[in-house]
């Protein structure tokens, strides 16, 4: 039983950090040095490595003294001095005024079985003192009645001396409270209390005795606390440190002391913050604020109730008030609505000192130095004088404007991955070009080309070519600048700190020798540059051309548009496609897909050609690099600046998302053959053309990667995963590791955005837990795929977890017959995934989702499956009693049938108020146990994130003692233990409203199911829906028309197959008369078959029509030959074989008759097929839900 050790309070306090803080040295943030001005200016720095428990020991005695001063403030016998000293490790704190009552404590004497006096109880007995039960108007800094005892328990020895005007009490306390000597009590008229002690330094991580450095460092900290206390108690009481009075008896003096060296001669703004109701109005707060550009972040010193308060709602209240004024003034000054100042910006140049008392506060944090009080106390009762805020705001705004000025134009940085041209910056600088490579692989290609040497003597080399890496990404400079109009009307463009510190862009500026103050309109100005031009060498994919190159152009257009006008910005246009004809080693090269498409249409066949795509520069081999660099000059194209470019740069890279959204609602207009020929003939590319084609294509592609299509509710990545899954698991649905399946998708579906993001998407597609995005998982996850606890972020590594296709569900939701009718994406000339699916049910409104993209927000809340089924069936079935009503609603764009949020896997409540639904968690209140048990959270709220949000809310944690989470992945059980007497106060403070009761408000057990129904359209661009009904109404015709297309295509295929099989049967019957074996070749045999009326057919197309359209079937199927007859083997001419063919024809004819019948169905062709497929999907969903989507 040795493991079940029993420890008393004293021993526990010696060993555990929970009482006074860490018991060893740690780095403590927020420790600031102070400065004192004697004859010479003297700085007292404070190092950050200290033992919190030791500082707590000293602080407890100081706070006890200031508490006593406040308690005696309005009494006859006041505290006139507090003497603090520290010498050779011995700390002492003394104050006059009434001493501790020297009377016996009956209860303690009875327990100890000896005479115990009140001073001993106050200093040696844990959980005893005057601060345990505090009144609401109490302004004491003490909290739990353990502070002085902690000082004793961490002291080698201590001497307590107190005099109450009649007697003097002296008591020695040794060995960390283990040896308490009897007190000496003598008559005395004095009135004071003094405590001296020697901490156990060695136990707390210090030398014992203290080293000189430690002694000086601790002395500086204690001096700081003495100065703080001097400001707190004011001029009526003198604070001494080592017998020297502290001169900081006001908040102004304290602020000056802190900033004497760091911000000398700064204006100090002071004010008094008053309250309008008792008890707060009895204790105004004194505030001093120092505003200086030398401060780089907001800092504050708060001495509240004598405690050095590290944070609290009073500071937040002041910061928000300052920020509100600064934002207003800043907007009036800069006159730029797109320029936003944050709370951090507004307060980063301020040092604030707050001194005073606040009644009824709680002290939290391990060292009990974090102020906690309901935030609405300040909003309701306290007010900050407007004159103070106004005068201070003017200074803050002036500093903000200065900080974003152009004084930092020539900041020098270390430029990574830069190779200088030998002639750069010299007499031949204008003949040099800087090659800006997209990344490391592009740098390797350039280096290979520039070092060809003798094999390419007339080609480019390092003599006139430098190289620099763009690092694979460029910052959007357009969003990092602010235009400020001065009083004189001049517009100044200022860069923010992020832009000036950006290594890539600043590296380009430094390497080229660019000056932000120069416009480069004249040749004389341009001649000062270190290079004659910059050549962008980027991949031919959307990321390279559309994003990186576009951002580089935008950067130059923003600061130096004249350089583009004079041809300074160029690009290396490398071949996108090479076509090798069989037997010919010289390829045909194409730089745009439109060129290749036009060429391909003119070819009779590409069977003898090999087509290779080069979207990445790294795809070119050594031979191809040599070939390119022999004609390097011909591959360098110059950008030109046309009239419409300025507006397009603003649209695609500026801060006005509404302009960009309007532009991106339409698709890209591809380059025409005439345009590509024009570009090649002059080797010039208008910026507007690049932006309208490449940049817009990238933006639209980014949207499709982040926002789903309304037809299938899928982003491009998820669509690739589904298409890859249907292909990969088609023949064998055995489980595969996530990373293996990810590799398959990347290879077969041409995924180009990294393994990590792909594997993450696969894992999400298999997640199924309460609150997950997908109510209908695409894959069955085998292993740990994440839980509700962390919102799925706790999934296992892709190397260890596996997936298999949820085939029973997927194959019913996405019928195989649809796959031949859908439009497909072509990557590198090969068919990849469909541009969109059209599932049997509207998946876009059946699952959850949220994502932003290019100014749009996408947020959906899954709708009730039963409502969706009812609506879709009513739309299809003309015998449904609600059929006509629904069609009337669709025609008139109204709603008649419910389409409620899904409550599947959710044990809470859904309620509607106005136009929005709200989800509510559930809870059980136990007044007897003073506890609330949360049994369900609002929809899609992860457990850990929820608990963290509660803990971050100080006004809620003021009532909470402990939060314990016993939740599983399926169920919620969160125990919220309240502090004593908190329940009634919670109900009083967190008011009940129509939408939520007090407990729901307090525990944040409600969220709004607000939707942003922005989806990608089938042909690209965004469509904005106003309701889930609109999505459903838009989706229905696409699914409906698919049945007619499917049936018409099936009819065409059946007819062709019947024609072919009938011809074969006829040939078998007439083969003896035709006797084709007597003819010498197939051509002659074909002539005979033609003369006898046998149709020439394209057997391969009829047998495997796959992606052929009806038009292609009708045109090409009857333009074949007679291989289907001439390839028949002898056994296929037997009577048994003929009989089987006749039966096959009958079955096909029967199916054709059925198809013809389905095409004549009402209200539309294939209506009954759709109903059957809906039944199959519903059955699969029910089975999936009943088996946790394992289907077994």
Curated annotation (Swiss-Prot):
The record marks 799 as: Transition state stabilizer. Residues 707-1174 form the Topo IIA-type catalytic domain. GO terms for biological process: DNA topological change; sister chromatid segregation. Transmembrane segments: none annotated. Mg(2+) 1 binds at residues 438, 539. Type II topoisomerase. Processively relaxes supercoiled DNA. Displays DNA-supercoiling activity only when associated with the viral histone-like protein. Its EC number is 5.6.2.2. One of its GO terms (cellular component) is host cell cytoplasm. Mg(2+) 2 binds at residues 539, 541. ATP binds at residues 64, 95, 142-149. It comes from the Viruses. It is found in: Host cytoplasm. Binds two Mg(2+) per subunit. The magnesium ions form salt bridges with both the protein and the DNA. Can also accept other divalent metal cations, such as Mn(2+) or Ca(2+). The active site is at 800 (o-(5'-phospho-dna)-tyrosine intermediate). It is an enzyme of class 5 (isomerase). Induction: Expressed in the early phase of the viral replicative cycle. It comes from African swine fever virus (isolate Pig/Kenya/KEN-50/1950). This is DNA topoisomerase 2. Its cofactor is Mg(2+); Mn(2+); Ca(2+). Belongs to the type II topoisomerase family. It catalyses: ATP-dependent breakage, passage and rejoining of double-stranded DNA. GO terms for molecular function: ATP binding; DNA binding; DNA topoisomerase type II (double strand cut, ATP-hydrolyzing) activity; metal ion binding. Keywords: ATP-binding, DNA-binding, Host cytoplasm, Isomerase, Late protein, Magnesium, Metal-binding, Nucleotide-binding, Topoisomerase.
